Amino acid sequence: MKYSFPAFENGFIRAAAASPALRVADCVYNAEQIIGVMREYAEKNVQLLCLPEFALTGYTCSDLFLQDTLLRGAEDGLAAILKASQGLNIVVLVGLPVRYTGKLYNCAAVVCNGELLGLVPKLHLPNYGEFYEKRHFISGMAEPECIELAGQETLIGTNLLFACRQMPAFVLAAEICEDLWAPIPPSCAHALAGATVVANLSASDETVGKSAYRRALVCGQSARLLCAYLYADAGHGESTTDMTFAGHNLIAENGSLLADTAPFAGEAAVTELDLGRMVQERQRNTTFMPETTGYTTVEFDLPPISLALTRPVSCTPFVPQDAATRAERCELILRIQAEGLAKRMEHTHAKCGVIGISGGLDSCLALLVAVRACKVLGRDAKDIVALTMPCFGTTKRTRSNAEILCEALGVTFGEINITETVKSHFADIGQPADKYDVTFENCQARVRTLELMDYANKNGGFVIGTGDLSELALGWATYNGDHMSMYGVNAGVPKTLVRHIVQYVADTCGSDTLRGVLLDILDTPVSPELLPTAEDGTIAQQTEKLVGPYELHDFYLYYVLRFGFSPAKIYHLARTAFDGKYEPEVLLAWLKNFYRRFFAQQFKRSCLPDGPKVGSVTLSPRGDWRMPSDACNTLWMAELEKLEV
C-alpha cells in the first residue's frame, strides 16, 4: 500500500482533466455524464476537475446555440449538476453557453458543493479557419457583474479568482480554449493576480501536428506563469461534420508535463499538483510582480485530506531518468566545468593545473574536467599535474587507480608520501599517532593542501579543488584543508550526479584502459581515507556509513535549497520516493542529521573558493545561497521532532 500523508498541509491537491462522452445538443444526457464523472473522481479524492468547453451542449452545436430550447436545456443541466455536487468535496469547471443582457457568452461555470461560485466567459473568440464563434458569441467582460443562473445569484467576468479557505496556495482561475492561443492569454493576468492553477476548458479539433503544438503551449504557459495548468479537450461525441475532436487532456506544472493522454484514447489526465512549490517559485522570482487591480476573489471550502501521490517523486532529483537526457546533461556539465576552469587558468597565466588525486570519484571528475580545460585552451594534458599523497589510510586499490587514470589521460603524475610529514606535525602539536580523532584526520587533509599549494606556488601552478556540492552541504571537508583551493570545479555537482558523469565518460571515452579504471573507481566505496586501512588492506573508513547515504542527502539538499520546503514536507516526499528501500526511522534519522550538519557547517561555505554553477542548486556564498554562519536550526529540528514514523 502506497504511503499516504496530509496533502493539504503540504501543498498538494489532486486534479483531473476529463472529456466525458456527450451527445450534441442533448443537455440531459450530457449532464448525466458529467454528474457520473464528477462522482467518480470525487470518490478518487480528486479535488479539482476540469471539463471541456461546452461540455453541457457540445461545442459543435453551431446555430443551435441561438435556440432558446438549447439555452434553457444548458441551464437546467447546470442546475442538475449543482444539485448533484452537494456533499462532494470537489471543484468542477463545466463549459456551457450563457445568455446575459441579451447576448451569448461562452462560459466556464465553477461549481463546488452545490454552489455556483462564478462564471468565467471566453475572452478571445476565434473567427478564422474552421471556427466561427463570433457568429454566436461576444467576448467576455473583464470586471465581474452580477447574474442569476440555474436558480443562483453569482458573478460573471474574466477577472474572477476562486480561493480555497483551507489552502491559501490553492487559487483557481479559468480561461477557454483560444484564450491560450492569443498573444497575451488572460491567464497571464490571472497568474499575476494570484492564481496558482489555471484551468482551460477547450474544444480543440485534431489535425496533423496539433497535439505537439498544444502540448508545447500548455507547458510553456505553465512555465512562464509559474503555475499549474489543466487543459480539458472535447472528445468523443462531438459532431464530425467538418472536424474531429480527440480528447487530448493535459496537466502541466511549471513547465513540466505531469499528465498527457493520447489523442482519441478517451482517458482523463489525473495527477497531484504541488501548489506549495508554485508559491515558493514565485516568491523567489523577483520579476514576478503581483497585480490584483480589477480582480474579485470568491472563496470556497474543501476539507483537508490525505493522499498517496501518484505523480512520480524521483529518488535522484539531480539525475534525469531518461538515458538520452542524462547523457546530454552530463556532457553539458562537463563543458560548463571545463570552460570555467579554462577561463580561470588563462586569466591567472597558470603554467600548470595541480590536483590532489586520490583514486576516488571527486578527484577523478576534477581531473577529467582539467584535461578538457586544456583542450579548450589548446594546451597539452601534461600541463595538468596530478599528485597522489598516500598516508595512513591509502589503499593499494585507490593508489593504483590514481596512477592508471593519470597515465590513461596523459597528465603529469607525481607522488608525495606525506606520512612522515604528518607524523612530524603530530609531534609539533602533541597529537598521539594512535589517537584516531578529528585532529588525526584533519592534519592529513591540511598537510595535503599545504603540499598542493606550495607545489603550485613553486611551479607557477594553480590548485584545482575537487570537493562536490554534497560534501559542501554536509560540511564533509576539512576547513582550510580539502575545503580550500584556487578554483573548485565540482562545487556545483552533487555526489549522485558525479557518479553518472564519470559513468558517462566511461561509456563514451573510446579507451578500454580509461573505461576500466573509471568503472573500478565507480565501484570503490566513497572514503576520505584518513583512518588506517583494515587488516586486509581495504578501506576502513566509509563516508556513507558515517554521514548517511548520499542519495538521501542529495534528495534532502534538492528540496531544501531548490524549493525551501519544510522538513515535514521533505520527509513525506522521501517516504514516497524511497518507499520499500529505507525504513521511515532511517529516513527521519538522516534528515535530522542533514539539518544538524547543514546549519553547523555553514562557516565553511561562507568562504568557499570560486567555482562554476552548473544547476539550479548551488551553495556559493556569492551567488545562490547566502546564510549566516551562526544561524540556529531550532525551528527546523522542532518540526522534525513532531513527525511520527
Identify the residue ranges that each predicted region occupies.
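ATP/NTP-dependent adenylation/nucleotidyl-transfer catalytic domains that generate, transfer
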Residues: 13, 22, 30, 168-170, ...
